[in-house]
Amino acid sequence: GIVNTNTKVTIDGKTFLHRVYGGGFGDPFSTGNNETGKIGGNTEVYIQGANIYGDVFGGGAGVAPKDINGTYTYFTNVAKVSGTTKVEISGEAKIYGNVYGGGDIANIKSYITLTGSAKEAYYNTKPKSESKLDQTTGKFLSYEAKDYTTFVNITGGDIFGEVFGGGKGLMKADAPDYQKVGRINGNTLV
């Protein structure tokens, strides 16, 4: 199916033996590009006190390109997130895998070609993050992030893998145009 708006996943105190996704799950039996598992808005994943024995993704689970009679089909819209993704690891969370701001061979936003002033404005807009602390006690007061496409925020927990602002893509040997899936069409903030 398709979610037209936003998704939010919160895990606190449970054990998962598989991967966690903020986005949708693509149909692995697809033979043509479609919108199965597409999220029309933003995704948020909050892991506060869980044991996760797998990878964590802000985006969805896409479908690898298929060679059908000598022609590759790329599933660029399958499990795509149209908005932004946010992954936050905090508290006593234990992640026994990798953390990705993006998806698993699934795109975040659409690829567009910019020219002129639109291109200049895009490249001049950088992701920003700001923590506010009490100047007297050093106590954490608030945190704000903006102008990002994918955002990974780690305020606690233990991660026994790697952390990526982007997604998990393909190797060059997997398909001639391997770069078409697993893209972050924007910027990342970790």
Per-range role (PLM):
Residues 1-19, 24-55, 61-190:
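Surface-exposed loop/turn motifs in large extracellular/passenger domains
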